[in-house]
């Protein structure tokens, strides 16, 4: 990125844009670094309505979403093994029953997003849907994961349905679409749906993950040889998605806490989670980080 000339103060719009880019770059690095610390960001956080039938029931950074329908509910991401108790408390605080969850989805088969699935499956009897690329990872309790299988495992679960790229999953008239966005994990999935508010329809994107975990090589990866090409595919896919509400597997991807505080102050219009510019900036920053590492690794090759 070109260095700005010191010709005078930035305009408000330029300042906001630069702040967004710096934040996104920081998130791209911090989200990868957080993998070093077990249960990072797994502190209790208030459950709240984002818009329409879409609710946040996750923790400070480990995001979980409740999507309510007349025929039962979706739950996207289950957190660590001890996260389900907080998810349940949030669901019930919002006036819903955890036993009405019918489908458990996930963004990726890393332990911070799926270790709680066994608890929730037992509690709710819900069906587990997962990327067809990560069925084996979930059913092995993470042992076959290309990055963390050697270090961190979790209770294995039975996957009831293997989700393919582009598949639409419908419950009670509400549809979520799966977009394979691999690289961060081999079956990382970005989900999309639509919500409505005041007669207007909004496109929601739940980013599955774009960071490169610590210690992961993009060139000559021993257990994930196609990782670099998968990342390239992911950025093409993310750029193709229409996004109004920018959400993700980690609250840090999209500044969740700050946006929640703005919404809680009351009267925030538009809804602070409507952030298409923030989405584009996030994707730009994540791709730049990927390309920088890829270039550096190629230079170091003999």
Give residue spans per PLM region.
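Metallo-beta-lactamase
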Residues: 36-37, 43-44, 49-51, 100, ...
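Active-site environment of divalent metal-dependent phosphoester hydrolases
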Residues: 83, 109-115, 135-138, 186-189, ...
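Intrinsically disordered, low-complexity segments enriched in serine/proline and basic residues
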Residues: 2-3, 7
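Conserved beta-strand hairpin/beta-sheet module of binuclear metal-dependent hydrolase folds
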Residues: 40-94, 98, 191-212
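Active-site HxH/HxHxD metal-binding segment of metal-dependent hydrolases
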Residues: 82-85, 92-168, 282
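Active-site neighborhood of phospho(di)ester-bond hydrolases with catalytic His/Asp-centered motifs
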Residues: 76-78, 101-110, 128-131, 180-183, ...
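Accessory terminal helices/loops
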Residues: 29-40, 198, 212-302
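Bacterial N-terminal signal peptides that target proteins for export
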Residues: 13-22
């Amino acid at each position: 990125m070109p260095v700005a000339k010191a010709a005078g103060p930035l305009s408000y719009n330029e300042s906001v844009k630069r702040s967004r880019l710096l934040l996104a770059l920081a998130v791209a690095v911090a989200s990868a670094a957080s993998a070093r610390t077990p249960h990072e960001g797994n502190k209790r956080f208030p459950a709240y309505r984002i818009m329409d039938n879409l609710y946040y029931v996750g923790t400070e950074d480990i995001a979980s979403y409740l999507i309510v329908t007349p025929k039962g509910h979706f739950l996207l991401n289950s957190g660590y093994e001890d996260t389900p108790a907080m998810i349940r408390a949030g669901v019930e605080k919002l006036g819903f029953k955890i036993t009405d969850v019918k489908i458990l989805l996930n963004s990726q088969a890393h332990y911070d997003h799926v270790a709680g699935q066994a608890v929730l499956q037992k509690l709710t009897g819900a069906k587990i849907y997962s990327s067809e690329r990560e069925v084996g990872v979930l059913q092995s309790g993470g042992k076959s994961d290309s990055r963390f299988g050697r270090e961190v495992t979790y209770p294995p679960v039975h996957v009831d349905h293997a989700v393919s790229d582009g598949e639409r999953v419908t419950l009670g008239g509400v549809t979520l679409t799966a977009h394979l966005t691999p690289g961060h994990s081999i079956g990382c999935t970005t989900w999309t749906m639509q919500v409505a508010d005041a007669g207007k329809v909004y496109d929601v994107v739940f980013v599955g993950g774009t960071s490169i975990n610590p210690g992961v090589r993009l060139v000559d990866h021993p257990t994930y040889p196609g990782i670099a090409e998968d990342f390239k595919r992911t950025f093409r896919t993310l750029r193709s998605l229409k996004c109004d509400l920018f959400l993700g597997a980690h609250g840090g991807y999209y500044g969740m806490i700050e946006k929640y505080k703005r919404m809680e102050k009351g009267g925030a219009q538009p809804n602070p989670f409507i952030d298409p510019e923030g989405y584009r900036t996030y994707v730009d920053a994540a791709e730049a980080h990927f390309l920088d590492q890829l270039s550096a690794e190629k230079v170091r090759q003999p």
